[in-house]
């Protein structure tokens, strides 16, 4: 309790509205955030998720918790529970920081303001820096967790590519002064992943109604946020609107580098969205035919027998 109280006082003492330019040295804190997620997950796995998983999956049924099949079910539940905790916390944090900003509802303010600031010469608030460190720390941790901790699924390569691209996107968008855009990208991604992980946990817990509802919300949010809002609002702004404000004489060298590198990463993310949507759509059609919409998506039918962490 003493450590938590001290941390609370430290956070309360920070002026989160203070503005500063993004800098490479800010990422010196990244290893601390990665270790933070490692420790928190270990504690939740041992003292919270294990107990909840046993209760929801098996109820009062007497089972041997040391059997490999039993451990496999609990392990998958704990993975989804952990991801749900992160995505929900990340969504709440992103929305709390961005919701009242003008660029949350009008993409042109990604590039102008406050005052006479124009991209890329824009400062950001410390609270936005915190959102970035939180997300970058999680995905850095996730790369190692995917290799050494979590169940190896059949889309391991795609998931690893996603994590690496996400870390690169977060770091580069920060140092290239795209943090405003990045915070909204984080928010629209975390939202659909919350529904996905809730649906998985419901499926593992044999709660078919909740699994069906969560899966349908996941599909709807994926289409609206990742396949509609992301390309037609976010990518339009990063590829077109930004050029309307860029001082090409002042930034004739660094401006194009920032522009092409960041947009290349964003479009690669869109390619992954489309790839996963093809998988989701195929599974949705199959599940509608079998009248069982709650089955898992994005490769939960993993090759676990080939590799177990």
Swiss-Prot record:
- What positions does the domain TLC occupy? 75-289
Q: Where in the cell is it found?
A: Endoplasmic reticulum membrane
Listed GO MF terms: sphingosine N-acyltransferase activity
What is the topology of this protein in the membrane according to its UniProt annotation?
Multi-pass membrane protein
Where would you find the membrane-spanning parts of this chain?
27-47, 84-104, 130-150, 156-176, 215-235, 260-280
**What Gene Ontology terms describe where this protein resides (cellular component)?**
endoplasmic reticulum; endoplasmic reticulum membrane
| Entry superkingdom | Eukaryota
Protein name, as recorded: ASC1-like protein 1
